[in-house]
From Swiss-Prot:
Major location (coarse): membrane
Membrane topology summary: Single-pass membrane protein
Annotated gene: PPN2
Topology, Cytoplasmic side: 1-9
Residue stretches spanning the membrane: 10-30
Cofactor(s) annotated in UniProt: Zn(2+); Co(2+); Mg(2+)
CDD domains with a match to the protein in the record: MPP_PPP_family
Protein name in UniProt: Zinc-dependent endopolyphosphatase
Matches recorded under Pfam families: Metallophos (PF00149)
Family: Belongs to the metallophosphoesterase superfamily.
Glycosylation sites: N90, N241
């Protein structure tokens, strides 16, 4: 009888040990194979899809839209100090995304933005988004085939955003994410947006800034809110269905998005869109769309456009200002 009790106790002990071992193994697998169960120390704040500067009535106010800086801090400061004459109280600068990554001094560019929040506004480009994703998902290379398991970014109009092609997240994005850290990335998430709108009450003009651009009617027609992917990564749009946008030309129906403004812009004649992103097209100044990515990172030019009211003309003037990059 005593031997039977001992054998039963031994069997129960063995079963308990196996059960505990299975639990530990399961937790190990979930912890290291599911990023949702092992998020970074702190998640980033919700990012605004659109921020507005409303009711601009000050005739002395000037706005400077700046193309892709890509971490070229020296040229950025040359633009501010030498070409613009410094950021006085009457000047607001708007960076059109991709102000970090590739160049040598992304951290300095970010610090400048955060130290001059009242005068320097920013929209996020595809590279800022990729750096933020790299921060949220330090082991990003593991999830290329399972992107839905990644920790997403949160925007005011999209609560679970994951880029369509996460294979674009590189080791360089990961290094920059670690360099900037939570403090600076969270401040950028709060300070920047995906698009910015200026309402110039004096003339009734509306100016938009978005890294990749916008199609006619975005943010102007009820319920026409562009997606984060479009605002950050678009180059083409399906001319038969404007909600379909892409970075590459998918088929013969896809056209450069700004050609829609050339054709249909009269329906929104008081609107202009400033953008970067498309260095292959270079400086691309059209009636209602202003492309300012001139490949500073490739030793070309850093381009910007100053918007200033001319009292004599009774309208806003648009002045191109550029710096040679090296």
């Amino acid at each position: 009888m005593e031997d039977k009790r001992k054998r039963r106790a031994a069997t129960l002990s063995t079963a308990l040990i196996l059960f505990v071992a299975c639990c530990v193994y399961t937790l190990y697998i979930f912890k290291f194979d599911n990023p949702r169960l092992s998020p970074p120390v702190s998640l980033l704040p919700t990012i605004s899809t659109l921020k507005k500067i409303e009711h601009v009535t000050d005739l002395n106010k000037e706005y400077v839209f700046v193309g892709d800086v890509h971490g070229n801090y020296d040229e950025f400061i040359e633009l501010i100090d030498d070409k613009i004459g410094g950021l006085g109280e009457n000047i607001t600068m708007i960076l059109l995304g991709d102000f970090i990554h590739k160049g040598p001094d992304s951290d300095k560019v970010v610090s400048y933005i955060l130290n001059h929040k009242d005068q320097v506004k920013c929209v996020l480009g595809n590279h800022e988004i990729l750096v933020m994703m790299a921060y949220l998902n330090p082991d990003f290379s593991k999830w290329v085939r399972r992107p839905k398991l990644m920790t997403p970014l949160t925007f005011s109009t999209e609560t679970n955003f994951i880029p369509q092609d996460i294979s674009k997240i590189s080791n360089a994005h990961g290094r920059l994410a670690r360099e900037l850290g939570f403090s600076k990335l969270s401040q950028l998430a709060e300070h920047c947006s995906m698009a910015i709108e200026l309402d110039l009450d004096i003339t009734g003009d509306i100016l938009f800034g978005a890294h990749a651009g916008m199609v006619p009617g975005d943010f102007m027609k009820p319920n026409q809110i562009p997606g984060v992917s479009s605002l950050s990564n678009m180059k083409y749009v399906d001319k038969k269905n404007w909600s379909k946008t892409s970075r590459e030309k998918e088929n013969k129906n896809y056209v450069r998005w700004y050609t829609l403004w050339d054709k249909y812009g009269d329906h929104f004649s008081n609107a202009k869109v400033f953008y970067g992103h498309d260095a292959s097209m270079g400086l691309n100044l059209r009636r209602q769309t202003k492309g300012l990515d001139t490949a500073c990172i490739k030793n070309n030019l850093l381009s910007s456009m100053k918007v200033k009211y001319d009292i004599k003309k009774g309208q806003y003037d648009y002045e191109l200002i550029q710096v040679q990059c090296s």
